[in-house]
């Protein structure tokens, strides 16, 4: 029994650490490439459009994930996804091209989604009653921790543009090797056919039962990608230097790290819906404040930090809420849909905010994020749960 508990703890922490590397990769790539392209004089809207490559990769891979997961299990998908990310990172220094880097980001999106979807579904499948919120909060916390550290790699661009990509690929490889210590497992089987068409049929069931739980990942994707991809462009155009940008962007993730676990545990006690409504409204107020901070780096740091404390947990809270609303056999499809909605938000964010920065004074993009968070809070408030809570194993 003691050996089993030791293995279960090791399994959980390896999955969580792999997630932190995924966050680290995304947290580095978004501001790093935005800064490189901005210095090269590339148009802000094209810069934002290039950032969507990662999320197009997620969207492309999403409908194809469930069948191989059920057939091969969690471990092979995590290993394949990690290897794809590692190889793509190594190729960035090979050729500096707008469209080549777009393709590499697309492959990183596919690899990251394979890794995150498998780890996320694995964690929700073995989490015991009363620990789901805590476990998913730790999952989100370590993703945020990686995401917070990632932007600091932008400083290496002053030494050599290739250095951040090489360093990130080596770090990814080291953590990827730890996955070989895990025993492969498969999702809980159901009686339905595992096929491309059956996956879309399960998507329909997930949407019918738990559409409201898919809104937080959508909003989080829009907000996160906008802050990491569009904010550096806004900052550089308003006299904020690269060093300040590399401090302001992680403030959001640091705030998220501080409150991720407490909010997850609080949601276990009070319910996901109440906690989600509260944090979305607080985040709305923070970004309204950021819109009036203009080029004040200290004020922006404070707004990002407090916003991170609140809405930095919306993705993990959305996953926990989804797990509350769905029967266990629908969890893989539900987690895929979280990734799809997150990707839609992440694709829309950099492009729309890039256009706004191009044609306005830039700060309007904070108000757009503010409006989206407010609308999501209203929709969640109006949701009336019609299904009984899904029982989890004790």
Model-derived features: positions:
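Helix-breaking motifs and short loop linkers at transmembrane-helix boundaries and internal kinks
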Residues: 73, 94-96, 271, 293-295
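A late C-terminal transmembrane helix in Major Facilitator Superfamily
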Residues: 329-359
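Juxtamembrane intracellular "pre-TM" segments in multi-pass secondary transporters
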Residues: 1-9, 184-213
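C-terminal membrane-cytosol helix-exit motif in multi-pass small-molecule transporters
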Residues: 169-191, 376-384
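Helix-loop boundary and gating motifs at the non-cytosolic
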Residues: 6-55, 221-234, 238
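Cytoplasmic helix-loop-helix junction between adjacent transmembrane helices
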Residues: 106-142
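Structural signature of the two symmetry-related core transmembrane helices
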Residues: 76-90, 274-288
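Helix-to-loop junctions at the C-terminal end of transmembrane segments
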Residues: 61-73, 260-271, 357
């Amino acid at each position: 029994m003691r050996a089993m508990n030791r293995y279960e703890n090791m399994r959980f922490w390896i999955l969580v650490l792999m997630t932190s590397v995924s966050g680290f990769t995304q947290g580095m790539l978004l501001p790093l490439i935005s800064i490189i392209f901005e210095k090269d004089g590339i148009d802000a809207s094209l810069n934002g459009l290039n950032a969507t490559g990662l999320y197009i990769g997620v969207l492309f891979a999403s409908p194809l994930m469930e069948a191989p997961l059920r057939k091969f299990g969690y471990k092979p998908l995590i290993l394949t996804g990690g290897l794809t990310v590692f190889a793509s990172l190594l190729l960035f220094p090979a050729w500096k091209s707008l469209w080549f880097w777009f393709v590499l980001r697309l492959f990183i999106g596919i690899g990251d989604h394979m890794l995150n979807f498998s780890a996320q579904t694995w964690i929700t499948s073995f989490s015991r009653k009363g620990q789901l919120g805590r476990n998913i909060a730790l999952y989100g916390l370590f993703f945020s921790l990686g995401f917070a550290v990632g932007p600091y790699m932008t400083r290496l661009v002053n030494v050599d543009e290739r250095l951040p990509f090489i360093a990130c690929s080596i770090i990814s490889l080291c953590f990827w090797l730890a996955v070989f210590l895990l025993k492969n497992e498969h999702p809980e089987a159901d009686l339905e056919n595992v096929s491309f068409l059956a996956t879309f049929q399960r998507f329909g069931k997930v949407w019918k039962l738990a559409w409201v739980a898919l809104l937080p990942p959508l909003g989080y994707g829009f907000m996160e990608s906008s802050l990491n991809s569009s904010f550096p462009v806004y900052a550089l155009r308003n006299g904020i230097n690269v060093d300040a940008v590399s401090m302001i962007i992680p403030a959001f993730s640091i705030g998220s790290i501080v409150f991720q676990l407490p909010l997850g545990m609080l949601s276990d006690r009070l319910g996901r819906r109440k906690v989600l409504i509260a944090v979305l409204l607080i985040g709305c107020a923070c970004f309204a404040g950021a819109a009036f901070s203009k080029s004040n780096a200290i004020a922006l740091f404070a707004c990002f930090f407090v916003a991170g404390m609140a809405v930095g947990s919306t993705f993990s809270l959305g996953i926990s809420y989804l797990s509350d609303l769905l029967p266990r056999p629908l969890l893989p499809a539900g987690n895929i849909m979280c990734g799809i909605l997150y990707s839609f938000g992440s694709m829309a964010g950099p492009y729309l905010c890039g256009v706004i920065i191009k044609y306005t004074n830039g700060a309007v993009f904070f108000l757009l994020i503010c409006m989206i968070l407010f609308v999501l809070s209203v929709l969640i408030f109006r949701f009336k749960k019609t299904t009984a809570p899904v029982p989890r194993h004790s």
